[in-house]
Amino acid sequence: MASANSSAGIRWSRQETRTLLSILGEAEYIQRLQTVHHNADVYQAVSKRMQQEGFRRTERQCRSKFKVLKALYLKAYVAHATSMGEPPHCPFYDTLDQLLRNQIVTDPDNLMEDAAWAKHCDQNLVASDAPGEEGTGILKSKRTQAADHQPILKTVKASDEDCQLRISDRIRETSDLEDSWDESSGAGCSQGTPSYSSSHSLFRGAVAPCQSSPMARLGVSGEPSPCTSTNRSTPGVASTPQTPVSSSRAGFVSGGDRPLTSEPPPRWARRRRRSVARTIAAELAENRRLARELSKREEEKLDRLIAIGEEASAQQDTANELRRDAVIAVRRLATAVEEATGAFQLGLEKLLQRLISNTKS
């Protein structure tokens, strides 16, 4: 067991922190912390358990320390989940992960709001103090600063979703572009030169697709097919014999309508595809850069919030010490006044007895 005269100041030793987490890790406490919003009685019970273990820690100190650890864990968890650089250092990460992982799955919004824990912590401290007590005006400026900050990780989550949507839209556009080119390259049956346009479809065939039967497409029938000639005979004009198309160019894939060989795409189509690919790569790089910058900014904001919370907790501890010293001084003064009053009454009684005895004599 740790020393009984442990410091009740600002710094927490590793043994104290480990003891606090082991107490909060019990099923009774962690369930009450997740289900009860006003949990002052929970931290009172935790403070009593800490005193039984030999550490003098008040309810507010236990609450503030757990809030700081939760904010550090949430920062490291988000950095690890989004893979934005190296995750920040978080002491007791494994223990906190066992305590808070279930809360992330069941109630993520409540845990994300703990990123701005300083504001809520100060409000709980003010609500728990009786009106008229000393030391409540010390944290007014810190509450104003903490109130200006919004929940940090909601912003990170929204920006990450926006980046993912933009990336998926670009990938979908590229996929549609490739599909339209593939369909257009294999749709026409004629060997004539296709007419190209700048519409959403890369190019359209000059001749309508062949509507022959599957047997004709497979080349089983010996009859001539419209797809094997470049033009049709016109009435009144002698038709010239057409040379049969080689099997390498007329053959089709079994089970499909696309020919085995197709003409390569034109140069402008290749240039356009390369330009689209370069644009997508540049936008992806820009999105990654913006996401890294946003992550750094949010980490800085969270660090400032944690520093504000620690300073507020330190000032609250100082105010509690001053109030405790004042109460002790008032009690000592009251005891001294009572002793002086008793001595005065005793002397007065003796004086009266002497006067009475002199009068009788």
Swiss-Prot record:
Annotated ranges, domain Myb-like: 11-70
Alphabetical list of Pfam families matching this protein: Myb_DNA-bind_4
Biased segments, Polar residues type: 187-198, 226-249
Disulfides per UniProt: none
Origin superkingdom: Eukaryota
Region annotation (Disordered) ranges: 174-198, 217-272
UniProt-recorded name of the protein: Myb/SANT-like DNA-binding domain-containing protein 7
Biological source species: Homo sapiens
Higher taxonomy: Eukaryota, Metazoa, Chordata, Craniata, Vertebrata
This protein's encoding gene: MSANTD7
